[in-house]
């Protein structure tokens, strides 16, 4: 059993009843608490207390968001476009693409065209993320792009992974993903030229992709067909994944995606009362190059407090359970600098944790 210390508690900026759960981003030694409401996206610097508010171009149910490492710009990955805005809400650039709603064939010009349409209210979605240095935006969209011409519009739409210039939205690289997504998310890498992408296809599968941008072209490799990316180690050399059934944690080499070691939840983690199935959460974190923090909060639900565990990467062995000063809820998420965070059950605060001195 490992004791941990509470590094900080951060109050969320928006009412949880009308906003998404908060996320704590970490880039280059800086943390940024981000929370999306219907009318705005808020980015809070926990160290300085400075808050930046980005007016939202559409309600929060229509797509996903990303914030630049310096907190100065935000990207909204919507149903019809990837839009970059500054803190005034002014559009810096926009990349319009095929509509994510069902079989809709339209490359829309504005959100108002479908704002009141029920089918568009339940559209699938892509995602976007800034590179580590903030100079690139990686985006998963549905094709065709607005500038692809009539020939592309007549073809069966393909989903695309784009590398965009964060300054002006220029498409620098693109690759077809061959997927039919219901949603996706990105996993950043310390190297701005690399990025991970997990794509959920509902019952069709869950491919995980790894992209590399060499300044001229985007190359994409499939990590696994039933795989979810969880985190990248601080050195950038190791990748943590799980399978869609959440049976095991897999340590992989970023260079080629090769599986190095794994750890099954069953047999490693103490069982549940009544013999229920134990499985890993869809979120976990590298505390450092040699230590993973992972949880079984999903399978623990209904049986007691969420349980979190330390895993030694050298052999992918369970080092032990974590003892917190008070019960925690939900999974663990990476907070950088050897720390991780949890969100309180009422979603009103974020707790940042680190191993106690000597642990």
Labelled PLM ranges:
Residues 13-28, 55-71, 99-131, 176-190, ...:
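Repeated scaffold domains used in trafficking and secretory/extracellular systems
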Residues 22-43, 67, 71-84, 135-154, ...:
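Short beta-strand elements that form the blades of beta-propeller/WD-repeat-like
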Residues 75, 115, 120-138, 145-146, ...:
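Fungal eukaryote-biased detector of long internal structured cores
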Residues 84-98, 125-140, 254-263, 280-291:
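Conserved long hydrophobic alpha-helices within structured protein cores
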Residues 277-282, 287-329, 333-334:
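C-terminal appended segment following the main domain
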Residues 1-18, 36-59, 82-121, 151-178, ...:
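Surface-exposed loop/turn elements that mediate protein-protein interactions on large endomembrane-trafficking
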Residues 215, 233-243, 257, 261:
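A contiguous, surface-oriented mixed alpha/beta subdomain in the mid-to-C-terminal portion of proteins
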